[in-house]
């Protein structure tokens, strides 16, 4: 990122070279994105309604190749298990509506204590939808005293202890504050073996960050956004995964339901074949425009789409996914990512630019197998907003979360080792020199 104008930001009245380390919150715009979007805009301009079915990226099908590419290059799944559609929260609602099937005995959802608020709101709404009390339905995993991250040794006992009550497990692939990478394969196995329940994952901070193997890990479902590590633009189109073992039978004509009554004597109709919630784009494309009013579900994950994908957002994400393909996929990017984050950790902990131990605490696990690209530090003896603003004045863009967490992420697609070194110098200046 060469130049960024700060003139709209209070107290910063100059332009300079920027050190951008905030890809965990918003990825940068690829150089070719504007060119490609303008090309697609011209397609709409020149073809009008015909652009639904013709042109380089027909609007009605703009998600199809994108879904295939994301399945192959980003999450390692079968093509029929991935759909690029809607956004993370909507996709989560659609999948939770299918997989959260509370009964009198099993009605609880296992989550982390510091779950991302949006995910909490989704789960809370489904608990209430089924007529249950939220206070009775959440089992929360908490780190040990004076620790930031969850230990596998503490997750398994909690699953075993509550296996008779757990109806669903929902966790993040990578925790948004600490940057901790969860062992998705192992935890999914535990959920299946002991709680005998579906296990779902929020991959907002994992997709485009680390290699994923969703099919092979036997994950039931997952959702993600695309504006962070995938650089898909603000409010980018999201994605969902549903393992093929949960797919409805081919030729299924709409949802099939069973009726049961929960412990509050409320009658619930649950879909046992395909999505619980459907829409215009859940219908198979071959007969969608016959307008019969009879739902004919699309195959696999495509049945979990709701409406026509946004063409321009699909175009923006197409550019970004093609860049990842040109790099050889996530394994190559991860190799550089590990080196960048390891280098940053070395600089702030053991080099001549090391931060004083009483000025910070490293929150993210030091083991590269237990983290993604993000490195989070807890700042002591200084207001975190002041730290953020002082870094901003030096041209460093990262972000913070209250009460005192500074989140920094070297991105292999656009950060260099020199960037990381210059960042460490700025951190040293702000944290060490200011507090001396």
Curated annotation (Swiss-Prot):
Protein name: Kynureninase
SUPFAM superfamilies the record matches: PLP-dependent transferases
Cofactor(s) needed by this chain: pyridoxal 5'-phosphate
Sites where the protein binds pyridoxal 5'-phosphate: 88-89, 116-119, 202, 205, 227, 280, 308
Record's GO cellular component terms: cytoplasm
Entry GO MF terms: kynureninase activity; pyridoxal phosphate binding
NCBIfam families: kynureninase
Main location (coarse class): cytoplasm
Keyword Hydrolase in annotation: yes
Matches recorded under InterPro entries: Aminotrans_V_dom, Kynureninase, PyrdxlP-dep_Trfase, PyrdxlP-dep_Trfase_major, PyrdxlP-dep_Trfase_small
Residue(s) carrying N6-(pyridoxal phosphate)lysine: 228
Known catalytic reactions: L-kynurenine + H2O = anthranilate + L-alanine + H(+); 3-hydroxy-L-kynurenine + H2O = 3-hydroxyanthranilate + L-alanine + H(+)
Keyword list, A-Z: Cytoplasm, Hydrolase, Pyridine nucleotide biosynthesis, Pyridoxal phosphate
Biological process terms in GO annotation: 'de novo' NAD biosynthetic process from L-tryptophan; anthranilate metabolic process; L-kynurenine catabolic process; L-tryptophan catabolic process to kynurenine; quinolinate biosynthetic process
Pathway(s) per entry: Amino-acid degradation; L-kynurenine degradation; L-alanine and anthranilate from L-kynurenine: step 1/1; Cofactor biosynthesis; NAD(+) biosynthesis; quinolinate from L-kynurenine: step 2/3
Record's subcellular location: Cytoplasm
EC number: 3.7.1.3
Top EC class of this enzyme: hydrolase
Reported function: Catalyzes the cleavage of L-kynurenine (L-Kyn) and L-3-hydroxykynurenine (L-3OHKyn) into anthranilic acid (AA) and 3-hydroxyanthranilic acid (3-OHAA), respectively.
């Amino acid at each position: 990122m060469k130049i960024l104008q700060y003139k709209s930001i209070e107290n910063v009245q100059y332009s300079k070279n920027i050190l951008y380390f905030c890809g965990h919150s918003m990825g940068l715009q690829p150089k070719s994105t504007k060119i490609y979007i303008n090309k697609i805009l011209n397609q709409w301009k020149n073809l009008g309604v015909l652009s639904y079915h013709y042109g380089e990226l027909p609007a009605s099908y703009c998600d199809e190749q994108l879904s295939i590419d994301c399945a192959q290059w980003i999450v390692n799944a079968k093509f029929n298990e991935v759909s690029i559609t809607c956004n993370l929260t909507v996709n989560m609602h659609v999948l939770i509506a299918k997989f959260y099937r509370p009964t009198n005995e099993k009605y609880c959802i296992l989550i982390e204590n510091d779950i991302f608020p949006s995910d909490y709101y989704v789960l809370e709404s489904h608990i209430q939808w089924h007529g249950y009390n939220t206070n009775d339905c959440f089992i929360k995993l908490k780190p040990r005293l004076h620790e930031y991250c969850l230990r596998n040794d503490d997750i398994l006992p909690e699953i075993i202890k509550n296996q008779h009550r757990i109806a669903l497990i929902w966790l993040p692939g990578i925790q948004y504050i600490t940057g901790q990478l969860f062992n998705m394969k192992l935890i999914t196995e535990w959920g299946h073996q002991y709680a005998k329940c579906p296990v779902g994952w929020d991959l907002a901070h994992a997709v485009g960050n680390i290699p994923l193997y969703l099919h092979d890990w036997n994950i039931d479902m997952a959702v993600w956004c695309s504006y962070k590590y995938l650089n898909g633009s603000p409010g980018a189109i999201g994605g969902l995964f549903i393992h093929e073992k949960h797919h409805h039978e081919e030729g299924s004509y709409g949802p099939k339901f069973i009726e049961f009554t929960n412990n509050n004597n409320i009658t619930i109709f649950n879909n046992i074949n395909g999505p619980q919630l459907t829409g215009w784009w859940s219908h198979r494309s071959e007969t969608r425009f016959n307008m019969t009013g009879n739902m004919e579900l699309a195959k696999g994950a495509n049945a979990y789409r709701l409406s026509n994908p946004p063409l321009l957002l699909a175009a923006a994400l197409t550019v970004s996914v093609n860049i990842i393909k040109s790099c050889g996929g996530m394994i190559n990017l991860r190799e550089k990512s590990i080196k960048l984050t390891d280098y940053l950790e070395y600089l702030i902990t053991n080099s001549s630019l090391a931060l004083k131990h009483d000025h910070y605490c490293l929150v993210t696990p030091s083991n590269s197998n237990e983290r993604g690209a993000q490195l989070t530090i807890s700042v002591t003896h200084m207001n975190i907003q002041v730290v953020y603003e002082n870094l901003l004045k030096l041209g460093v863009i990262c972000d913070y979360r209250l009460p005192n967490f500074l989140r920094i992420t070297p991105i292999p697609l656009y950060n260099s080792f020199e960037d990381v070194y210059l960042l460490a110098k700025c951190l040293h200046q702000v944290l060490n020199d200011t507090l001396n």
